[in-house]
UniProtKB/Swiss-Prot annotation:
Its biological purpose: Involved in the biosynthesis of the chorismate, which leads to the biosynthesis of aromatic amino acids. Catalyzes the reversible NADPH linked reduction of 3-dehydroshikimate (DHSA) to yield shikimate (SA).
Protein family (similarity comment): Belongs to the shikimate dehydrogenase family.
Molecular function in Gene Ontology: NADP binding; shikimate 3-dehydrogenase (NADP+) activity
Keyword DNA-binding: no
Enzyme Commission number(s) from the entry: 1.1.1.25
Assembly behavior: Homodimer.
Coiled-coil residue windows: none
Leading EC class: oxidoreductase
CDD domains linked: NAD_bind_Shikimate_DH
Name of the molecule in the record: Shikimate dehydrogenase (NADP(+))
Short name of any one Pfam family annotated for the protein: SDH_C
């Protein structure tokens, strides 16, 4: 990395963020593509967000990545939102276009781009996704925008279940895609939906302990099913081991992590991130 008077900045903004892998990914991408940029991690309090946004314009930055807890809080500061960001109601990438700040959400498109190596396209396919948090909503919204045939969301019945149901109903109306919510504990219903499923995704945190499964292990998976776990800190979760044991193709969350970064990098620089090389380096770091 050769920092000089022409070097431009990008940064990830969150709290906490010092543990983030994003600086490693993006700075390696800058080096590999000969792009004169540097990427930092900024851990800031919520009241500093307006100043951070002003910095993007003042310092002519590429833009920002936004992580928890600011993905929704940052949206009012944007001049424009991409279709995905507007649909999701959250921004994870800010792009500076000559002072005009455009909010994008690359989580969903990054997720599906990471599945291209399996020649998987969600169009006219059915997805069953476990969980209803931010990552799940981004994946659901992108699946709907990409023309999925049907999306089934399985979540635990809790205080957030009814708000999730209402959010999914709005997504369904806006996109014209069938999106259903079911109780994650209803194994019979899940088994019925699994028979028609092409893509099974775990977007919960269950499995981070290396022991827990997010669903009943008695469930039988159909043939030719692609199974993905959004967790990347545990490279093969119990969920993926269980699916692999039934003959399914499996993918961990590292692809989504790098995929969303690659989409942000392209929006900032117009260059394709060398995903294969970066994935290899990330695996060495594990």
């Amino acid at each position: 990395m050769n920092i000089n008077g022409y070097t431009r900045m990008a940064a990830v903004v969150a709290n906490p963020i010092k543990h983030s892998l994003s600086p490693f990914i993006h700075n390696l991408a800058f080096d590999l593509t000969n792009e004169n940029g540097v990427y930092l991690a900024w851990e800031v309090e919520a009241e500093k967000l307006p100043a951070i946004v002003d910095n993007v314009r003042t310092l002519d930055m590429y833009g920002l990545n936004i992580s928890m807890p600011y993905k929704t809080e940052i949206t009012p500061f944007m001049d424009e939102l991409s279709p995905a960001a507007e649909l999701i109601g959250a921004v994870n990438t800010v792009v500076n276009q000559s002072g005009k700040l455009i909010g994008h959400n690359t989580d969903g498109i990054g997720f599906f781009n990471s599945l291209e190596k399996y020649h998987f396209n969600i169009q006219n396919k059915q997805m069953l996704i476990l969980g209803g948090g931010g990552a799940a909503i981004a994946i659901i919204a992108q699946a709907a925008l990409s023309g999925a045939k049907k999306i089934v969301v399985a979540a635990r019945k809790s205080a957030s279940y009814i708000p999730l149901k209402e959010k999914l109903e709005k997504l369904s109306v806006k996109t014209g895609i069938e999106i259903l919510l079911t109780d994650l504990s209803e194994a019979d219903r899940l088994q019925k939906e699994l028979k028609q499923t092409d893509l099974l995704v775990n977007a919960t945190s269950v499995g981070m302990d290396g022991e827990s499964l997010p669903l009943e292990k008695s469930l039988v998976l159909p043939e030719k099913l692609l199974v993905v776990d959004a967790i990347y800190k545990v490279r093969e979760t119990p969920f993926l081991r269980w699916a692999k044991g039934q003959g399914a193709q499996t993918e961990n969350g590292l692809g989504m992590l790098i995929g969303q970064a690659a989409e942000s990098f392209y929006l900032w620089t117009g260059k394709k991130m060398p995903v294969a090389e970066i994935t290899l380096e990330m695996e060495k770091e594990a």
